[in-house]
Amino acid sequence: MASRRNARRLEPSPPSGTAPTRTALITGAATGIGLATARALSENGWRVIGTALPGQDVTSLRDLDRTTVLEVDLTDDESLRVLLDAVVAQPRLDAVVSNAGLAVPGPIEGLPADQLRRQLEINTIAPAVLARALLPQLRATGGGMVFVGAGQGRVALPFGGAYGASKAALAALTDALRAEVAGSGVSVSLIEPGAVRTGILTDSTARGHEVLDGMPADVAGHYRAPMLATFQRAEQAFRTAAAPEDIARLIATILDTRTPKPRHLIGREARALALIALLPSSWRARIVQRLAR
C-alpha cells in the first residue's frame, strides 16, 4: 500500500514572478531506469515524486534533492488511490514517467496464471490508470507522459510471451492515447529499449528458474533445455546492455522537447527486433523459432 506518512506535500510553490519548478511522477524509481531518471531530473531542477515497492531500499532515491518517496503496490487499488490523492494534491504536475515493470519468463504452458496477470497489471494496466487520472493536471501545464516499453513489444520472444504481450499492449495504449490527446498540449512518448543493465534482467532469470522448478515434470521436460539456453543468452546480453543512465538522458531530453517523437528505439537489441518486425511473417516466425532451441 502507498504509505500515507510518505505522501507529504512537496516544497511550497516559488514566489510570484519566478519560474515554477517542474514536477514529475516516476514509477519504479528505487532502482535502475527509474532511479537514474529521478537523479537526472533532480539534477536539472525538477521536483520528483518517486514510487517504490513497500520494503524496497530507497536510500539512494531519498538522498536526491526535491524528491518525495511513496511506497506503492501498483497492483493494489487502495495503494493506487493513495498515490493518486498525493499527486493530485501537488501544486502542479509536468510529467508522468511510467517506468515500473515486471518480467517473469516462462512458456505459456507452464507460466502460472497469476504471473501472467501480474505482468499485465504492472506493465499495462497501471500506466493506463495513472494516465487516465492525471491527464487533467498535465493539460494544465502542457506536460508530457513517457511510457517505458520494450523492444519485445514489437516481436514476442520464446518464454517472454507474457512480458511481450504486456509491452505490446502498452504500445497500443500509448498510440491510441497520443491520438486522443492531440492538440491538448500533452505529449505522449514510448521508449522501446532492448537489454538494459538493471535488476529486471537478473531478477527475471531468477523468476524464470522458479517457474521452471514449479512446473510438473512432464511439462518441464519439454522446456528445460531451451529455457536454460535463453537464460544464458540473457546473461551474455547483460554484459553489452545499455546503461540505465542512457535511458534516463533520453527521458530528460523528451521532457524538454515540445513535440517529441512518438517512439524511441534505444539499444542494439531493440533495433534488431524492430527490423525483424518488418519482415514477412513466415521469415519472422523462423527467426523466432530458432531462439526456442
Regions found by a protein language model. Give the residues of each.
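A short, exposed helix-loop element centered on a Lys and neighboring polar residues
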Residues: 131-132, 175
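Active-site helix of classical SDR
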Residues: 131, 166-169
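Conserved glycine-rich cofactor-binding loop
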Residues: 30-31
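Conserved NAD(P)H cofactor-binding loop of Rossmann-fold oxidoreductase domains
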Residues: 99-104
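Rossmann-fold cofactor-recognition segment
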Residues: 64-78
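Substrate-binding pocket helix/loop in short-chain dehydrogenase/reductase
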Residues: 107-108, 115-117
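C-terminal beta-strand-loop-alpha-helix "lid" module of Rossmann-like NAD(P)-dependent dehydrogenases
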Residues: 183-235
